[in-house]
Amino acid sequence: MLESSNPIFEKKNVIVTGGAGFLGSHLCERLLQEADVICIDNLSNSNIQNIDHLLQYPDFEFIKYDVNKPMDLDQFEELDKFKVKFQGVQEIYHLACPTSPKNFEQLKLNSLWANSSSMISTLDLAVKYKAKYLFTSSSVVYGEPTEQRIAFSENDEGIVNHLSTRGCYNEGKRFAETCVETYRQVYGLDVKIARVFNTYGPRMKLRDGLLIPDFILNAIEDKDLVIYGDADMEFSFCYISDMIDGLLKLMQTGPEMSLVNLGSDQVYKISEVADMLIKMTNSSSKIVYEAPLSIFMHKGKPNLQRAKEMLGWIPLVRLSDGLRNTIDYTIANKGMVEMNGDHPRLYR
């Protein structure tokens, strides 16, 4: 197993790719309590406003860069304060990947690159610095649930149509996991794969086709909440703070722990969530049903036995509390969203 011999002068140096995105910005925020944080993002599908409040901290540095390309940290003078040339990097969280249902077709190649080129680029960085490496994969690697199998465990191989409309993302995540595991086998890297299930909370992109924020926006505007499917469709929802706890706990484990499901194992009917949001926003919106869209995919729930036993992790935030926080954020930031007319409400 590769182990870094570089001295840690004050705090460990941690890279977060996709750090200006939804998950990444919350992760950077939490890591600042214990580390020097190098946030890397090309802002192609994220928002600098997510990390505006972090730019003031001396232990935080934002670098606009496309990690699909090889990266030489020595070329960035702004990282001299972290003594990267001498201390190196201790941890890499690789989160960068476009996930925009609204712009899914336009971002297909970006998704392909994120699950291939950027994997090699960031894994090569981990080899150079002998850094621990965590990749955020997705529940899509399991394929769709069946009547016989609703909850997925880490040993389930899954069935994914690699030539489907979603193949660049779904099969892309499977290939990305293969990259991670291959680097472990060849270089002895201490690598982690988090299979992330549906996650929600403040800083999700608004008007981008994501279920919870679009439901909230439509509810506060008294517009119809459109469910693409039937009233019995179910999803699990994990609040962002719980997900960040899980990622941090996973990174803290030794090389014996390399793969885990993170998400909520409690499912709700989409119609129930829509009804909750209508009531919580005192909305006059109606729930309507339409045929599923071409990129829609049913998703199962995670079996969390490994997360509970190996990480001591379970999601703690109640759905009602998480939705309230997300509603408050959405109302506060609604005016910052440019209104370009209606577009379909999709599911990630």
Language-model segments: which ranges?
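N-terminal Rossmann-like NAD(P)+-binding domain of SDR-like oxidoreductases, especially those catalyzing
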Residues: 1-197, 325, 332-339, 343-348
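A short C-terminal helix-loop "cap" of Rossmann-like NAD(P)-dependent dehydrogenase/epimerase domains
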Residues: 58, 153-160, 215-227, 253, ...
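C-terminal "lid/loop" region of Rossmann-like NAD(P)-dependent oxidoreductases
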Residues: 230-232, 257-260, 269-275, 282-299, ...
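Non-catalytic, hydrophobic alpha-helical segments
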Residues: 243, 247, 262, 273, ...
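Residue-level signal for the nucleotide or nucleotide-sugar donor/cofactor binding architecture
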Residues: 106, 114-117, 167-171, 207-210, ...
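Hydrophobic alpha-helix immediately C-terminal to the catalytic Tyr-X-X-X-Lys motif of short-chain
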Residues: 175, 179, 183, 215, ...
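Hydrophobic "lid"/C-terminal helical patch
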Residues: 27, 247-251, 274-277, 323-330
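Glycine/proline-rich active-site loop of Rossmann-fold NAD(P)-dependent oxidoreductases
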Residues: 146, 174, 190, 199-213, ...
